[in-house]
Amino acid sequence: MSIVAQSAVTHFRPVMILAGGTGGHIFPGLAVAGALRARGVPVVWLGATGKMETHLVPKHGIEIQTIAVSGVRGHGMLALLGTPVRVLPAIFAAMRVLRRYRPRVVVSFGGFAAGPGGIAARLMGLPLIVHEQNRAPGMTNRILARVARRVLSGFPGSFVAEEVVGNPVRRDIAALPAPGVRFAGRSGPVRLLVLGGSQGARVMNDALPVVLRVLSDADVAVEVRHQCGEALRAETEGAYAYAGVAARIEPFISDMAAAYAWADLVVCRAGASTLAELCAAGVGSVLIPFPGAVDDHQRRNAEYLVAAGAALLLLQQDRAFYVYLESVLRDLLSNPMRRLAMAEAARRLAKSDVAECIAEIILKESI
């Protein structure tokens, strides 16, 4: 299946990007695609039929081809035993796409289609580059890393043989002033930014209003901006209203650079792209990893920032989660010097011009 947003006819062999399933795979791929296209390099995308990438990628003017493939993990022993039956047709479908476009290099950012696409690329003798966003690499990239020409990572320690390049972030976030400049002269309530992700995070929607009410009773002044996801908007508004806490509730924040610039502290999940943004912006955070993340990769991501002094880590499955959250926020909201130190530590972890760096590596490996 083909969803066309730019002509497939070109005088140059394209770069093929393999990415999909979640925004954590797709958005880094889009950033690198933008860097390649800015150099006049055509890009074509291989994704999975019916997944998120089929809607997002064409909006950026990139042609996407899709193959029928689904994930294996978490679907039981019968699914695992049936993997060859399901994966082999996907590999053959990917090979047909590769023969049609004859890409100069294939780049995997992970996701459903990346496995068949990467295997097909190597079977056809095409250069394969892997970029892993998380500290705990996904199964697809773990497999492909064994046969890839270059293995790139967003965090150190993902692979034994790796090149740590970081994760791409938007230019407007990376261009924000240093924390010391942003925080200088600020007064009034502490600005707390809560990020639940595009789908929202119910634990944050439930816990933050309760904890902030306790803190307000203790005369801790806070201005809250809470991004909750469209599906949980009414629920989140109700929780804050019931707690008697004023907050700006938003299902989606389109200008994340402005949001980070506004914030004194962030409470959020620990996806790789979000953490890259926190570092690029230079803002301290309280990280609550999603406990259902594959291989507990969000916790592994969070531990990297914690070790550098850029964040604090809380586990929502802890029986004393509310107590710990209240204690942590009470300390951070009343301690501007600690917030600044965390923000500066985050900024020191930032990698600059990541998309351009990856694009340069891709072009060096092109055939």
Curated annotation (Swiss-Prot):
InterPro entries named in the record: GlcNAc_MurG, Glyco_trans_28_C, GlycoTrans_28_N
Subcellular compartments: Cell inner membrane
Catalysed conversion reaction: di-trans,octa-cis-undecaprenyl diphospho-N-acetyl-alpha-D-muramoyl-L-alanyl-D-glutamyl-meso-2,6-diaminopimeloyl-D-alanyl-D-alanine + UDP-N-acetyl-alpha-D-glucosamine = di-trans,octa-cis-undecaprenyl diphospho-[N-acetyl-alpha-D-glucosaminyl-(1->4)]-N-acetyl-alpha-D-muramoyl-L-alanyl-D-glutamyl-meso-2,6-diaminopimeloyl-D-alanyl-D-alanine + UDP + H(+)
Major localization class: membrane
Gene3D superfamilies: Glycogen Phosphorylase B
Pfam families per UniProt: Glyco_tran_28_C, Glyco_transf_28
Annotated signal sequence range: none
Keywords: Cell cycle, Cell division, Cell inner membrane, Cell membrane, Cell shape, Cell wall biogenesis/degradation, Glycosyltransferase, Membrane, Peptidoglycan synthesis, Transferase
Molecular function, one GO term: UDP-N-acetyl-D-glucosamine:N-acetylmuramoyl-L-alanyl-D-glutamyl-meso-2,6-diaminopimelyl-D-alanyl-D-alanine-diphosphoundecaprenol 4-beta-N-acetylglucosaminlytransferase activity
SUPFAM superfamilies tied to this protein: UDP-Glycosyltransferase/glycogen phosphorylase
EC number in record: 2.4.1.227
Its membrane topology: Peripheral membrane protein
Pathway given in the UniProt record: Cell wall biogenesis; peptidoglycan biosynthesis
GO biological process assignments: carbohydrate metabolic process; cell division; cell wall organization; lipid glycosylation; peptidoglycan biosynthetic process; regulation of cell shape
A single Gene Ontology CC term: plasma membrane
Annotated positions binding UDP-N-acetyl-alpha-D-glucosamine: T22, G23, G24, N134, R170, S198, I253, Q298
CDD domains: GT28_MurG
Membrane listed as a keyword: yes
PANTHER family: GLYCOSYLTRANSFERASE (PTHR21015:SF22), UDP-N-ACETYLGLUCOSAMINE--N-ACETYLMURAMYL-(PENTAPEPTIDE) PYROPHOSPHORYL-UNDECAPRENOL N-ACETYLGLUCOSAMINE TRANSFERASE 1 (PTHR21015)
Family, as annotated: Belongs to the glycosyltransferase 28 family. MurG subfamily.
Protein function: Cell wall formation. Catalyzes the transfer of a GlcNAc subunit on undecaprenyl-pyrophosphoryl-MurNAc-pentapeptide (lipid intermediate I) to form undecaprenyl-pyrophosphoryl-MurNAc-(pentapeptide)GlcNAc (lipid intermediate II).
Protein name: UDP-N-acetylglucosamine--N-acetylmuramyl-(pentapeptide) pyrophosphoryl-undecaprenol N-acetylglucosamine transferase
Source lineage: Bacteria, Pseudomonadati, Pseudomonadota, Gammaproteobacteria, Lysobacterales
GN (gene name): murG
